[in-house]
Amino acid sequence: MNLKKLIIILTIILMPFSSNAEESTNIDQYTQFSVYTGMFDFSDDGKKSTLIGFQHQNENLNRDTFLGNLSPVTGALITADNAGYIYTGVQAQYKIGALNFTPSFTPGLYHEGNGKDLGHLIEFKSELQISLDLSKNSELGFSYNHLSNASLGDKNPGANSYMFNFFKNF
């Protein structure tokens, strides 16, 4: 087989798998990463603790529903008392001009470390976040959340936390 025939055959085979520049620019590769810090269980004087955490959101997986634009989120936090929480769940986003309102619900796994005993390994985080667009690719926000085991354990004290958030889109 000569080289010319080989090139023609390879071109025909690979043509359906190629994309041109116009198609590539229409594909949105937007992902959001946020870091946050705040106060874990601020309403309990005996067990409140500072926290730091991160969260990832992939906009390519979002869905428009009757509840709004929903997308999956995954993240983790750790407190100064070595308590930790890893989670994954869903958030909705509502925009009013430069303001963003983002409620979320994320089940996860909690480890108390030297911090507050929340009564169970499985905890549910309900959160409301308000943020302001700083630029096309960044936001600054404030959020409040409640962590609870929904009475899965013998006790369910819950924890209320607030955080300051910085978001960066990539």
Language model regions located:
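Cleavable N-terminal export/targeting peptides
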Residues: 1-28
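Short loop/turn motifs that connect adjacent beta-strands in outer-membrane beta-barrel proteins
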Residues: 20-30, 44-45, 60-70, 95-101, ...
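Transmembrane beta-strand segments that form the barrel wall of outer-membrane beta-barrel proteins
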Residues: 32-41, 67-79, 102-109, 144-148
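Solvent-exposed loop/turn segments connecting transmembrane beta-strands
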Residues: 40-50, 76-87, 114-121, 151-159
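Outer-membrane beta-barrel "beta-signal"
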Residues: 48-54, 132, 157-170
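Residue-level signature of outer-membrane beta-barrel architecture
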Residues: 56-58, 92-94, 132, 146, ...
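Helix-adjacent hinge/juxtasegments
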Residues: 81-105
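Mid-chain, well-packed structural core segment of small domains
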Residues: 99-126
